[in-house]
């Protein structure tokens, strides 16, 4: 998933720059460079507002439940969302890692020419 870097200089800053560069690349691929990227972005934008379970997301986005599950599992695999519980209907929320670096989402949206407000209007709001 993410590369591991040796710190030859002992500088933590170097590690953070490389980590953020990798995170930005991952976001560009997940949100713009692969099929379903726009759906994943809409899911992230909704979860940024409040935690939601897959059924709620499917209803708001007007898509199949399995479609939402597929995208949530992918986002979870890359550490961008977390599930509150293991059970059915458990809510998902934005991970701390992504919450702290939400500016990268905005950067990626700018790179891809996506307007956050327009996406929320198209995808619906809870």
Task: Label the predicted regions.
Residues 4-27, 96-126:
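Amphipathic alpha-helical dimerization/coiled-coil segments
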Residues 32-40, 99:
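Short helix-coil-helix linker/hinge
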Residues 37, 85-91:
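Short, Lys/Arg-rich nucleic-acid/phosphate-binding segment
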Residues 38, 49-53:
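Short capping segments at the starts of secondary-structure elements
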Residues 41-45:
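Pre-recognition alpha-helix immediately N-terminal to the DNA-recognition helix
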Residues 56-60:
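A short acidic, leucine-rich amphipathic alpha-helix
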Residues 79:
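Glycine-centered, phosphate/nucleic-acid-interacting loop/turn motifs that mediate DNA/RNA or nucleotide
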